[in-house]
UniProtKB/Swiss-Prot annotation:
Domain of life: Eukaryota
Stated name of the protein: Monothiol glutaredoxin-S6
Task performed by this protein: May only reduce GSH-thiol disulfides, but not protein disulfides.
Metal-binding among keywords: yes
Species for this entry: Arabidopsis thaliana
An MF annotation (GO) of this entry: metal ion binding
Binding site for [2Fe-2S] cluster: C21
Alphabetical UniProt keywords: 2Fe-2S, Cytoplasm, Iron, Iron-sulfur, Metal-binding, Redox-active center
A Gene Ontology biological process term: response to nitrate
InterPro entries for the chain: GlrX-like_pln_2, Glutaredoxin, Glutaredoxin_subgr, Thioredoxin-like_sf
Cellular component terms (Gene Ontology): cytoplasm
Location(s), subcellular: Cytoplasm
Length: 102
């Protein structure tokens, strides 16, 4: 889990993804639609991607991708992010994290 913490440190939005995952792509599209500054880690392109994926599962992210962190806080996967959007809470959370300025 330390490897995950070091990757999300000092970044407003981090998405752990796999390049072949359509839900990961959808969440990236949603968040980038706000003009948010985000960092995306494609786990299938990392040499230690499986290790990071195991750490994400230990943190409670099932399925392991997408795993979204906003303001260094673990938000969850696609369902949790979409729920925030439906409740009109996602934009405010992105603002508080410094990912968007509006």
């Amino acid at each position: 889990m330390e490897s995950v913490r070091s990757l999300v440190e000092d970044k407003p939005v981090v998405i752990f993804s796999k390049s072949s995952c359509c839900m990961s792509h959808s969440i990236q599209t949603l968040i980038s639609g706000f003009g948010a500054k985000m960092t995306v880690y494609e786990l299938d392109q990392f040499s230690n991607g499986q290790e990071i994926e195991k750490a994400l599962v230990q943190m409670g992210c099932k399925p392991s991708v997408p795993a979204v962190f906003i303001g260094q806080q673990f938000i969850g996967g696609a369902n949790q992010v979409m729920t925030l959007q439906v409740k009109n809470q996602l934009a405010a959370m992105l603002r508080r994290a410094g990912a968007i300025w509006v």
